[in-house]
Amino acid sequence: MVVKSALLFVLAAVLEIGGAWLVWQGFREHRGWLWVGAGVLALGAYGFVAAFQPDANFGRVLAAYGGVFVAGSLIWGMVADGFRPDRWDITGAAVCLLGVVLIMYAPR
């Protein structure tokens, strides 16, 4: 269950962050409406991923995903845009990921 859940979180992050990045590139960086359209499709696909999480609680899944989004956004920025996080960015992302573990995988 944990592996499936973690993989779904990664897929959700790639779709959401990637989709938002494509929209950004298409609109703000003037790369064209095809980029924007691809971003919208990726964002739409992201909307379905949470439904496949093993946990049945929507609020829990989306709250935990928020932590993955924070860390994933920093990683995406590093890879795609040359962003260099500082120690506070990294510390904040680590705190968020700890929150993911507590919210999703703590014994209940």
Curated annotation (Swiss-Prot):
The chain crosses the membrane at residues 7-27, 32-52, 61-81, 87-107. It comes from the Bacteria. It is found in: Cell membrane. The keyword Cytoplasm does not apply. SUPFAM superfamilies: Multidrug resistance efflux transporter EmrE. It is a multi-pass membrane protein. Keywords: Cell membrane, Membrane, Transmembrane, Transmembrane helix. Coiled coil: none annotated. InterPro entries: UPF0060. The keyword Transmembrane applies. Its main location: membrane. GO terms for cellular component: plasma membrane. It holds the Pfam family UPF0060. NCBIfam families: PRK02237.1 (NF002586). Belongs to the UPF0060 family. This is UPF0060 membrane protein Mflv_3127. It comes from Mycolicibacterium gilvum (strain PYR-GCK).
